[in-house]
Amino acid sequence: MGRNPLIIGITGRIASGKDAASKIISNKYGFYEISADKLGHLVLHEKKEELVKIFGQKILNTRNEIDRLLIRNLVFNDNKELKKLESISHPIIFNKIKKILIQNQSTKIIINAALLFKINLEKLCDYIIVVKAKAPIIKNRLSYSMPSIDSNIINKILEIQKDIFFKKNIINLKIINIINNKNYAYLEKEIEKKMQEIINYERFE
């Protein structure tokens, strides 16, 4: 892009450890973190009227606000509804992130996005870190972090996210995999190794 010193994208399925990895990189290596998930929440607020027209009043809570749990359950049970939501939210999220990059051109950036490839954010990145974990481990983590979430919803989320790492015609992009089937200390050590690889590569570029 001819802009920021270094832009790393980080992606992974739900409960893979993606968010923890992003925070480690942000805090330890001085990267400014952009959360696509948080921007997605903002889009729900900004596009409330349009979304209510499409999905109906059933996505609103008692305060007449869009309820993320209600809309999540709706779209994860209907692929057509999911595509409608993505067609509205993804271009806006992409443009918001691009704007943040322009506003922070002297800063190292990490873009934290589960749907990084679906939103086309790989176009903005120098490197992409993919955090992976086995499905049983993901489910076990979710049983602790989100005990109220329905197991059927978990299975549908994992099914939807199974191909989030694959995209044709990715060229000139350095993709780094981290397998996170263990604990936080192990994840930290893996990140240290991978970040050292990036630092060494950048040094000799």
Curated annotation (Swiss-Prot):
Presence of keyword Cytoplasm = yes
**Positions with a binding annotation for ATP:** 15-20
**UniProt keyword annotations, A-Z:** ATP-binding, Coenzyme A biosynthesis, Cytoplasm, Kinase, Nucleotide-binding, Transferase
Do you know which Pfam families this protein is assigned to?
CoaE (PF01121)
Report the GO terms under cellular component.
cytoplasm
Q: Which GO terms describe its molecular function?
A: ATP binding; dephospho-CoA kinase activity
- UniProt cross-references to InterPro entries, sorted A to Z: Depp_CoAkinase, P-loop_NTPase
Pathway membership, UniProt = Cofactor biosynthesis; coenzyme A biosynthesis; CoA from (R)-pantothenate: step 5/5
Domain of life according to the entry: Bacteria
- Membrane-traversing stretches: none
Gene Ontology biological process: coenzyme A biosynthetic process
Q: Look up the EC number in the record and give it.
A: 2.7.1.24
Whether Magnesium counts among this entry's keywords is no
Report the Gene3D superfamilies cross-referenced here: P-loop containing nucleotide triphosphate hydrolases
Q: Which reaction does it catalyse?
A: 3'-dephospho-CoA + ATP = ADP + CoA + H(+)
Residues in DPCK domain copies: 7-205
Where found? Cytoplasm
Q: What family, per the record?
A: Belongs to the CoaE family.
Instruction: State the function annotated in the UniProt record.
Output: Catalyzes the phosphorylation of the 3'-hydroxyl group of dephosphocoenzyme A to form coenzyme A.
Q: HAMAP family given for it?
A: Dephospho_CoA_kinase
Q: What is this protein called?
A: Dephospho-CoA kinase
- What species is this protein from? Borrelia garinii subsp. bavariensis (strain ATCC BAA-2496 / DSM 23469 / PBi) (Borreliella bavariensis)
Query: What gene, per UniProt, encodes this protein?
Result: coaE
